Amino acid sequence: MPTPWTLLERAVTPDGVLELRARGERDLMISHDGRVLMSSRIHRSELAVAELGCAPIADRKAPRVLIGGLGLGFSLRAALDALPATAKVTVAELNPVVVRWCEGPAAIVTQGAVKDRRVRVVIDDVTRCIRAAASGKEKPYDAIILDLYVGPIDGRNAHRHPLYGDAITAAAHAALSEGGVYAVWGEDRSRSFEQRLERAGFASRFVLARGGGPRHAVYVAEKKKAATTRGRSSRRREGGTV
């Protein structure tokens, strides 16, 4: 008989009810209003979005990385493993309870990633952090990684979406250094989001991440020099699986 899940903590937040459950010491999951958001057993896509986002800029002298969404900390752990000791990583997380979980019972599955000296966690909306860099209030980032509860979607008003619409996608482009990378996790492929990346000036590719669970989408978009994108489409129709 399978070991039952134990409820470790339940938190009512402005976004809904978050629950942390455990089955043994290293088998953890976070749910939102009863829907499983992340699991310590199935997290290949979380690793992939961070690995793909950090790989192109990992050899920079002191790369600056912004991660939107903490979850169980797997994307943060993957980013830290890919980046040099000189890197500075800012994690924007809306819910303080999630940070506390990652510092406490969930720390074991990421070797205490949130307490790494390269990491700064802010309780804030990641779009505010993006806009601060886009406006020059903060230094530009070398990589921006979004690993949030929901990914890009298609639909009538998708271009106005606060996380993946035209305005914030353009802001992400402005918030990046030259050659910087915008890596975004998604549940499914969104053709309209790919078009928004193109309109913002990114050269992008779409990758399927799979490993012990359903395939999820990872968008890897690079900010190109103006001279290399002028006069031709900046969109790359590459694909792949990781």
Region spans (language model):
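N-terminal auxiliary segments of SAM/dcSAM-dependent transferases
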Residues: M1-S31
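The AdoMet/dcAdoMet-binding core of the Class I SAM-like
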Residues: H43-L176, V184-W185, A200, R205, ...
